[in-house]
Amino acid sequence: MVRLSYHELLILSNIDPLSTQIERLDSMAVGPQTYTLPRADSHCWLAVTGSQAAEMFSKVCGVDLRPHKFANNAVAQTSVAKASAIVVRHDLGTTHCFYVLTDVSAAEFLWDCLIDAMLEYDGGPVGVASMRELAAEG
């Protein structure tokens, strides 16, 4: 769960494909001034991991994401490669991990920008299976 503002929370499911976490939350009773706003159809969710992830972001994001400046579970609503984005640091065990959420219409553009930035650090896409392995280690 990430606090975006005083009255707004963002709840991300875990990376387990069989998780029913979000469905359980959707079925819970909520207060009169509370409502859910599903973002699965409007947002993409990317993850950048690794010891040089924060340095890589310095090429495409104005927020200082280095570990001593941007704590685990911190959130920033900012722009990444000129696309509006939410960046959440959510380490997987001892591996630095940054979740990037942006409008689905910017997904391909942002993906290309992140891949380009990763190349300088010998990084590249790894897929969800690798993310699950990192989460299991933590």
Regions found by a protein language model. Name each.
Residues 1-138:
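Basic, glycine/lysine-rich polyanion-binding surfaces/domains
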